[in-house]
Amino acid sequence: MRRVLKIGHRGAAGHAPENTLAAIRKGIELGVDFVEIDVRCTADGSLIALHDATVNRTTDGKGPIDRLSLLDVKALDAGNGERVPMLEEVLRVVSGQAGLMLELKVKGAAQKAVEAVQKAEFKGPLIYASFLHEELGIIRSVDAEASLMALFGRLPQASVARAMKYSPSHVGLRHDTVTRRLVEAFHDEDLLVFVYTTDTIREIQRAISAGVDGIISNVPERLRW
């Protein structure tokens, strides 16, 4: 029987502050196949795990992340006393424990992310994901074997065609856009299909019925197989 991969969204954001080491460790504890985190750059070029363009929602600070230094970010509380981790810290925690999915949120992150992964000698499967498909192209140009996931919100045909130029191995789709026919069409192109962010039992069952290969969830303990 086909096994659907379990991916912890922002670690396991249903259990601990998103994108923190606590959330990541919880995802690993819950047995995920992959931990997914978001990657952004600070003003001084450091890669950190953060979803939004500002720190307002997820920390006790304010301001755009691209105007804050790493030192500024390290002083912030990301919830429950957790800090915003650097990518290097994430790589150390996940290496050898689970796979890692890095969602690149900004232009210019791709090359730095590849260098950080190589420097860390990360052990385990790794997927680079992005809605910024040109960033995936940068990674493909330096690593022909990298696993790349082209993320989509809606699916205009032109956007799909542009993304395919970068030879992704995976596509990431909104759970409410997925149908069996769509999944089969991507499978016919030798692409694996993951869905996000799939939290309710009904959403999970629908994704499985559509034939997806991976489910990204804030509550991965609901992925019971």
Predicted regions span which residues?
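Phosphate-group recognition and catalysis centered on beta-loop-alpha active-site segments
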Residues: M1-W225
